[in-house]
Amino acid sequence: MAAISAFISLSLDGCYADANSDMSWAHSQDPEQAEFTSSNAKGGGRLIFGRVTYEMMKPFWTGPQAAQMMPDVAVGMNAMPKTVFSRSLTSSDWRNTRIATEDFVSELEAIRAGDLDASIHGSGSIVAQAATAGMLDELQVMLVPVTLGGGKRLFDGIPRAISWRREDVRQFSNGNVFVRYRPG
């Protein structure tokens, strides 16, 4: 059975995007964090995105900038199978990308029944839905030392409390802190 994990950057006030859906505040990396991110992203498996994150990621990872900045990661991002949850997209020209057509939980159950572990990147609403459905095996948070004063909060509106057990913590010189959690 495949595991489903999620990686998301959060502000100190719990937002994954500001009030204008901007996430540029989350992209400052020092060399140590860049190496960590690169090695973390090289793993195989399946990627899961919501439409908004997909539309942000596709032009970068299929373009020349990604190939120059992070060639190994770009190769992996383009080669790995990808599932995109969207109510408006019907097709994709990004290699190995499938638009989810079944209901959310059925799609995640099918992914878990497969052989490839899957990782949700960004896509805050998808992360919250997967956690609420009990389908998230691991939550990786990059805590960024900024307060946004408003925006899209990761777990706003979830119907019940979810307990998490900390598995790992890593601090970077730029002030970012990576925390790995499991349900429990």
Predicted regions and their residues:
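Non-cysteine beta-strand/loop elements that form the S-adenosyl-L-methionine
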Residues: M142
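Portal/gating segments that form or line small-molecule/metal binding sites
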Residues: A2-M135, P145-G184
